[in-house]
Amino acid sequence: MIRASAIQRTAMLLRQLRGFSTSATLADKIKVKNPIVELDGDEMTRIIWQKIKDQLILPYLDVDLKYYDLGIESRDATDDQITIDAANAIKEYGVGVKCATITPDEARVKEFHLKKMWLSPNGTIRNILGGTVFRESIIIPCIPRLIPGWEKPIVIGRHAFGDQYKATDLVINEPGRLELRFTPASGGEAQTQKVYDYTGPGVGLAMYNTDESITGFAHASFKMALAKGLPLYMSTKNTILKKYDGRFKDIFQQIYEQDYAAEFEKQGLWYEHRLIDDMVAQMIKSKGGFVMALKNYDGDVQSDIVAQGFGSLGLMTSALMTPDGKAYEAEAAHGTVTRHYRQHQQGKETSTNSIASIFAWTRGLAQRGKLDETPDVVDFASKLEQATIDTVEVDRIMTKDLALAMGKTDRSAYVTTTEFLDAVADRLKK
């Protein structure tokens, strides 16, 4: 009997060391009805991503992960076809979770001996799926906010299409006229407008957007606001860009009145267009609790401001959602944490915040559960999020960035990358 008991204890210990809980048998795992597309990434986040999967996901879920390695070497070896395949897989299965990836610059091309300077994987995926990028901060009450008044979530919807990010720009080296010309495909008369008469060197730019993309952006934004139970504000500078930004304003208003006004009123919510400068001022003064629909550049900038205002860039989720809700991709809003990865390569201690990467998994799982109508999967995602928050809020176990945000600089105030994930795993078992 004693020997049998010792064997049982040893077996239990081995399971725990492998990252499995005592209830981790296949029969006890929660069944995820349909596949999730997993997009692996680079550097420190790649290491964290694997640990999250091994410690917090696979021990509890019976899930079919369609794996695509979007690490920079894999993208280079496949001429970036792996990114295209991954995006199409998300389109097929409906839900993807993505690790942070490197977007190579000239230095990265040399470092990895790349064939070329590959495009951003996020940009490629967005172009294939369409949709809107929504960024939302993860609120942990004990983490001081740079903007103390923010008590409720602020969700930033970024129209990730066109504008400056697909613009054509040029350097002007001599006097001359810059013109904007549109030639109809129907063969009709071309339209030409003078932009500027240069008397010396300068720069020029032309950018675009489409009614189709703006319409999709509007639908995704209204649906997100309803899903979150929050009012929606659309912000532009239509007083200056009367036709360009005015088109955004008009399309949003038309779609709201046609398709969403009744449901918004039913839920006690509202939609309003505001000038971007006025909206930013109101955002700073507010208590939070709304969705902001912003053009591409504005959304890029404001999402980082909101993240830092809530306490840390490491506490922000990012989700790409199509207007019809049939494709959804979740990821952390931060990068690959190169500086920590260099320390890891040297065998040095790291204290990297994994919370946003954990939430990439949970948000993807929650969406999968909603689509599949499997509340146990949604419930697990919620429990994992709460376990992560409680590790910081209740146990006061946190990584260095969060400790510094609380004004704590002693080494005893924070734990290593691995120790934090271990603590979350322990919390999840309770």
Curated annotation (Swiss-Prot):
Any Gene Ontology CC annotation: mitochondrion
Q: What class of enzyme is it?
A: oxidoreductase
Matching InterPro entries? IsoCit/isopropylmalate_DH_CS (IPR019818), Isocitrate_DH_NADP (IPR004790), IsoPropMal-DH-like_dom (IPR024084)
Cross-referenced SUPFAM superfamilies, in alphabetical order? Isocitrate/Isopropylmalate dehydrogenase-like (SSF53659)
Cofactor binding annotation: Binds 1 Mg(2+) or Mn(2+) ion per subunit.
> Could you say which EC number(s) this protein's record lists?
1.1.1.42
Q: Which UniProt keywords apply?
A: Glyoxylate bypass, Magnesium, Manganese, Metal-binding, Mitochondrion, NADP, Oxidoreductase, Transit peptide, Tricarboxylic acid cycle
What the entry lists under Gene3D superfamilies is as follows: Isopropylmalate Dehydrogenase
Q: Which residues bind substrate?
A: 103, 120-126, 135, 158
Site Critical for catalysis: which residues?
Answer: 165, 237
GO BP terms = glyoxylate cycle; isocitrate metabolic process; NADP metabolic process; tricarboxylic acid cycle
Q: What Gene Ontology terms describe what this protein does at the molecular function level?
A: isocitrate dehydrogenase (NADP+) activity; magnesium ion binding; NAD binding
UniProt catalytic activity: D-threo-isocitrate + NADP(+) = 2-oxoglutarate + CO2 + NADPH
* Taxonomic superkingdom: Eukaryota
Q: Main localization of the protein? A: mitochondrion
Q: Required cofactors, per record?
A: Mg(2+); Mn(2+)
* A Pfam short name: Iso_dh
Q: Where is the transit peptide?
A: 1-27
Query: At which positions is Mn(2+) bound?
Result: 277, 300
Instruction: From the Swiss-Prot or TrEMBL record, state where the protein is found.
Output: Mitochondrion
Entry's family note: Belongs to the isocitrate and isopropylmalate dehydrogenases family.
Q: Provide the function of this protein.
A: Mitochondrial IDP1 may regulate flux through the tricarboxylic acid cycle and respiration. Its probably critical function is the production of NADPH.
What is the protein named? Isocitrate dehydrogenase [NADP], mitochondrial
